[in-house]
């Protein structure tokens, strides 16, 4: 008996009301060569009772002894997936019947692609379509397809535009790229897409709504638009940009940022090349991106780059950059500006004490 072609992986937690519908949508796929792997994150409701009502032999259940969060539960899914492909779906979402068929057909015909996504229809807690939010999410998540280098440029400047719940990927690609980073609480999906593209895999969006994404009341979704979520997302997005520091050649940098000023394929030593790449990444973040987290990332990167032996001389020789320019740049550090504004009386007091010395 041959192994199935795809693992439908369902990280599950306290979704007793919805998990049955999610499992049934998997069982109803037009493509039937699959196993269903459910990893329950120590649910405290009757989710497990609902799961165990399904007697299909293709269902495999792993129950965590303690609650670990969606990232780690998804990682357990990936680690335990044994088939060629893996489809990750939340335990309150619904797969359209042709989802697996269409996504697997694409990957089977395009061997250089590591993952394929789709659009999604937004439904409420009762399964009713929210047309307004579906239209909004269509604009966000059904972007024009492009090469992995072009995706990387988009991710760098604009952040995520991929519907994570629609993922179907090569299992080997996810295992090679590494797990979801559980320390990245809001942008762990973007973090993985960037690493996947940097690893050399192309990604693709099928512009059909192959998933029903459930938006819960009372901000119960991980991605709900709350103040806390927005703060965490800004923090995460700055950290996610650090993935771009893995770019090790000017050739790759130019493929991602072909319009970058000052980038040229002349000969440098390995040490010089890395300093120049990091400086060019600083420039991309500092001058060409609109968000404060880009500026915070850029200023921190410039500081780290200038710690390297000979960095100031290399940057001065190739870009005319000097220490006076660095001093001007760090005064625009968003965190510093914010702290100075919040603590203006204290800052003035400290400054006066220094001036007396």
Q: Where do the PLM segments sit?
A:
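Conserved donor NDP-sugar-binding/catalytic core segment of glycosyltransferases
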Residues: 98-133
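Short loop->beta transition adjacent to catalytic acidic/histidine clusters or analogous donor-positioning motifs
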Residues: 3-6, 27-38, 46, 57-60
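Conserved nucleotide-sugar donor-binding catalytic segment
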Residues: 79, 96, 118, 141-263
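Short aromatic/hydrophobic "clamp" motif used to bind/position activated sugar donors
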Residues: 86
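C-terminal subregions of glycosyltransferases and related glycan-biosynthesis enzymes
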Residues: 156, 198, 214-357
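N-proximal low-complexity "stem/linker" segments adjacent to membrane-targeting elements
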Residues: 1-27
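A conserved acidic beta->alpha catalytic loop
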Residues: 25, 40-49, 66, 90
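Glycine-rich, basic loop-to-helix element that forms the pyrophosphate-binding segment
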Residues: 22, 64-81, 94, 102
């Amino acid at each position: 008996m041959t192994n199935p072609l795809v693992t439908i992986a369902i990280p599950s937690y306290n979704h007793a009301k919805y998990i049955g519908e999610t499992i049934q949508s998997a069982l109803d796929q037009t493509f039937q060569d699959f196993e269903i792997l459910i990893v329950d994150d120590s649910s405290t409701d009757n989710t497990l009772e609902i799961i165990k009502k399904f007697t299909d032999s293709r269902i495999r259940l792993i129950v965590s002894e303690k609650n670990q969060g969606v990232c780690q539960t998804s990682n357990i899914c990936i680690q335990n997936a044994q088939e060629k492909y893996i489809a990750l779906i939340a335990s309150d979402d619904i797969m359209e019947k042709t989802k697996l068929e269409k996504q697997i057909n694409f990957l089977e015909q395009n061997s250089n692609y590591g993952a394929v996504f789709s659009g999604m229809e937004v439904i409420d807690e009762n399964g009713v379509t929210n047309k307004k939010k579906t239209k909004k999410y269509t604009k966000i998540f059904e972007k024009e397809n492009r090469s992995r280098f072009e995706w990387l440029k988009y991710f760098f400047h604009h952040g995520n535009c991929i519907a994570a719940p629609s993922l179907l990927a090569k299992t080997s690609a996810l295992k090679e790229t590494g797990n979801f980073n559980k320390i990245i609480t809001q942008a762990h999906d973007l973090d993985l897409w960037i690493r996947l593209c940097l690893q050399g895999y192309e990604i693709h969006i099928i512009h059909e709504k192959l998933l029903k994404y459930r938006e819960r009341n009372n901000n119960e979704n991980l991605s709900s638009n709350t103040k806390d979520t927005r703060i965490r997302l800004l923090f995460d997005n700055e950290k996610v940009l650090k993935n771009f520091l893995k770019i090790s050649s000017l050739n790759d940098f130019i493929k991602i940022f072909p319009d970058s000023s000052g980038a040229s394929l002349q000969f440098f030593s390995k040490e010089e090349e890395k300093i120049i790449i990091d400086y060019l990444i600083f420039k991309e973040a500092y001058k060409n991106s609109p968000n404060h987290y880009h500026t915070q990332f850029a200023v921190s990167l410039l500081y780290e780059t200038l710690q390297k032996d000979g960095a100031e001389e290399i940057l001065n020789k190739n870009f005319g950059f000097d220490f006076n320019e660095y001093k001007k740049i760090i005064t625009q550090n968003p965190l510093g500006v914010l702290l100075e504004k919040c603590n203006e009386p204290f800052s003035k007091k400290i400054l006066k004490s220094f001036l007396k010395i």
